[in-house]
């Protein structure tokens, strides 16, 4: 059995970790970084860029550079959160045939958010494979604790498209608690994990206890907001900069995708700088132009102004903390430690708000960017049997149930129930002689069914005719360790049963997933060919440069026929490099190498010939010297002078 890797698939950045010698180790990517931007770009020439390389070219390719797609995964296009996002991103978001939110490139290619996320997961997979020197096929992937069933299913689908068997989906705060608490001694403790990442917010109250020599991590309660994160903080800064520029220049930069992408980068940089300084300057020369000429943006931003812009967002994160504590039956004073996770928690205003609410300073010894991936790797180690004596008891974040008469939401499994779990409830018919019932499965907390998230609808038919209220239909809910739901309905009299694994009511069909898997495989082959072509071109380019240098240095020493052959080989290779035929480039590179060797050989021979002539002259001089007789001379004085 190979390694089960741990992946934190983040909104802004992703991270991969493995268990290595009993310790979790975060693996550096090919650029030498421990985290990878969750950004995917499609270039004009068909290349797919992932991570830092995609981020670097975002300003010049905004409509084909996709970031923060985690906020779209498993969502309907009509969701309020998706509609809000449309005005903040330069790329296209549109409705797929099933109502899901998909993204679109500038040449109208449509893709599911799962496909974009799969590209990031592939990069994480490759990072682990390069380090381990072996294939990786299994992973534990983290999701926000407050992700619903559709979003969890969609994340598993992304893993499948990336060629990964997702052994477990675990909640990000729970993973962070594993990373924090695995090696900690000192008895039972209750911790709060406040996880404010790039696009989502979670808080979990977790009890860490020693039970019969086993370390038990039990989630007591969880809450959150899957559309609150660093992206929203960035957007507040962008809106402020756009408004200030509009006041000054009368130009609305929201209509310019290129300017919007530059503003996004600048806003993120300014926000980060203001975590360690009191003031920064956003300076974007040539941000746009009008009839009067180019326009430059230069705006000072203070920490106080930033805090005023995002104050309501920070407050918005505190209410779920209050709810989670209440659900756990605890007070803030009962919490022993507060752990901060997610890059946005580096903001002093956020740290202060958390300290004020819990009445204690959050711990600073947990890396907010890496803790979640480390926890995922530990869970992978538990599943593989490499990590012993650890038990993880997670919960379902939202209540699950069905719609009953009058549009009422009847809960079958309450929120914060430890998973895996099963629960059943018996219902009956609403009309006389009803032969079928429709089971409408929902997730949420509202009393009215229509305000909750619809997960699935299915029919149980073949019920024997009887007066209303007589038939007994047992509806059973079964949540697995990934937090994914299976539902069955059974007529107790006839034992007829209908089972369904909840596929995100929207979501991808098996056929779509298979197509995307095949597409990813084809792209992997295409990417491999592309990189081989680039390597061949780079090698050829280096040889051309070296050969031209050799001609400059040695051309005067060799005959014209040798130089002619080298020049011809150079010209042939340069022509080949304009095309995409790798075999031709390699063949002509070899020809130039051989021509270059003949140039060096001719130059060396010419130099040796020169040396031989010099040696012959020296020999003659030596012989002449040998004929001279040594003599003593006596000075004769001329007295006649």
Curated annotation (Swiss-Prot):
Q: Which Pfam families match?
A: HSP70 (PF00012)
- What is the designated name of this protein? Chaperone protein DnaK
- InterPro entries documented for this protein: ATPase_NBD, Chaperone_DnaK, Heat_shock_70_CS, HSP70_C_sf, HSP70_peptide-bd_sf, Hsp_70_fam
Q: Which PROSITE patterns does the protein's record reference?
A: HSP70_1 (PS00297), HSP70_2 (PS00329), HSP70_3 (PS01036)
What does its record list under induction? By stress conditions e.g. heat shock.
Ranges for the region named Disordered are: 605-627
Q: What ranges does the record list as Low complexity composition bias?
A: 605-623
Q: Which family does it belong to?
A: Belongs to the heat shock protein 70 family.
Modification sites for Phosphothreonine: 200
UniProtKB keywords: ATP-binding, Chaperone, Nucleotide-binding, Phosphoprotein, Stress response
- What is its biological role? Acts as a chaperone.
A Gene Ontology molecular function term for this protein is: ATP-dependent protein folding chaperone
The cross-references to NCBIfam families, in alphabetical order and at most eight, read:
PRK00290.1, PRK05183.1, prok_dnaK
Entry-linked SUPFAM superfamilies? Actin-like ATPase domain (SSF53067), Heat shock protein 70kD (HSP70), peptide-binding domain (SSF100920)
Q: From what organism does this protein derive?
A: Xanthomonas oryzae pv. oryzae (strain PXO99A)
């Amino acid at each position: 059995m190979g390694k089960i890797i741990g992946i934190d698939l983040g909104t802004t950045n992703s991270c991969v970790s493995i268990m290595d010698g009993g310790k979790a180790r975060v693996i550096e990517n090919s650029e030498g970084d421990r985290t990878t931007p969750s950004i995917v770009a499609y270039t004009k020439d068909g290349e797919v860029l992932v991570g830092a390389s995609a981020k670097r070219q975002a300003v010049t390719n905004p409509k084909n550079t996709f970031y923060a797609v985690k906020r779209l995964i498993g969502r309907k296009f009509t969701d309020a959160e998706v509609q809000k996002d449309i005005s903040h991103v330069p790329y296209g978001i549109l409705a797929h045939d099933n109502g899901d939110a998909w993204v679109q490139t500038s040449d109208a290619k449509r893709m599911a958010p799962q496909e974009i996320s799969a590209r990031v997961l592939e990069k994480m997979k490759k990072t682990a494979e390069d380090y381990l020197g072996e294939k990786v096929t299994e992973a534990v992937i983290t999701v926000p604790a407050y992700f619903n069933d559709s979003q969890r299913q969609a994340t598993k689908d992304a893993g499948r498209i990336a060629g990964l068997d997702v052994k477990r989906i675990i909640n990000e705060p729970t993973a962070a608690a594993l990373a924090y608490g695995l090696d900690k001694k000192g008895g039972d403790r209750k911790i709060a994990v406040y996880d404010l990442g790039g696009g989502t917010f979670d808080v979990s109250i977790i009890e860490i206890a020693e039970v019969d020599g086993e370390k038990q991590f039990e989630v007591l309660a969880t809450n959150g907001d899957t559309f609150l994160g660093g992206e929203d903080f960035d957007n507040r800064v962008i809106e402020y900069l756009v408004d200030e520029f509009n006041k000054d220049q009368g130009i609305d930069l929201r209509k310019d995708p290129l300017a919007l992408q530059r503003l996004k980068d600048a806003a993120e940089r300014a926000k980060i700088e203001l975590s360690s300084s009191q003031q920064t300057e956003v300076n974007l020369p040539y941000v746009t132009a009008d009839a009067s000429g180019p326009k430059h943006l230069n705006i000072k931003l203070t920490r106080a102004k930033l805090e005023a812009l995002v104050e309501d967002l920070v407050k918005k994160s505190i209410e779920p903390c209050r709810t989670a504590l209440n659900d756990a039956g605890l007070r803030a004073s009962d919490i022993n430690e507060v752990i901060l996770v997610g890059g946005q928690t580096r903001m002093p205003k956020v740290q202060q708000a958390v300290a004020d609410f819990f009445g204690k300073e959050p711990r600073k010894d947990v890396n907010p960017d890496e803790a979640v991936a480390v926890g995922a790797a530990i869970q992978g180690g538990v599943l593989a049997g490499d990590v012993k004596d650890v038990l993880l008891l997670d919960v379902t974040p939202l209540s699950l149930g069905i719609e009953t008469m009058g549009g009422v939401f009847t809960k079958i499994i309450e929120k914060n129930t430890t998973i895996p779990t099963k629960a059943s409830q018996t219902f009956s018919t609403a009309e006389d002689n009803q032969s079928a019932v429709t089971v409408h499965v929902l997730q949420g907390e509202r009393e009215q069914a229509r305000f909750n998230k619809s997960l699935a609808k299915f029919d149980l038919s073949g019920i024997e005719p009887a007066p209303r209220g007589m038939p007994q239909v047992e509806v059973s809910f079964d949540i697995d360790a990934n937090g994914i739901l299976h539902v069955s309905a059974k007529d107790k009299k006839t034992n007829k049963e209908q089972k369904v694994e909840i596929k995100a009511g929207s979501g991808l069909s098996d056929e779509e997933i298979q197509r995307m898997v095949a597409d990813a495989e084809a792209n992997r082959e295409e990417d491999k060919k592309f990189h081989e072509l680039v390597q061949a071109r780079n090698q050829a380019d280096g040889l051309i440069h070296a050969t031209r240098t050799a001609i400059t240095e040695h051309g005067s020493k060799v005959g014209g026929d040798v130089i002619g052959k080298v020049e011809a080989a150079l010209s042939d290779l340069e022509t080949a490099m304009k095309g995409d035929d790798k075999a031709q480039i390699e063949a002509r590179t070899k020809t130039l190498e051989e021509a270059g060797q003949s140039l060096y050989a001719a130059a060396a021979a010419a130099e040796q010939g020169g040396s031989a002539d010099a040696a012959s002259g020296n020999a003659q001089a030596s012989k002449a010297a040998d004929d001279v007789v040594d003599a003593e001379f006596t000075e004769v004085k001329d007295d006649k002078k």
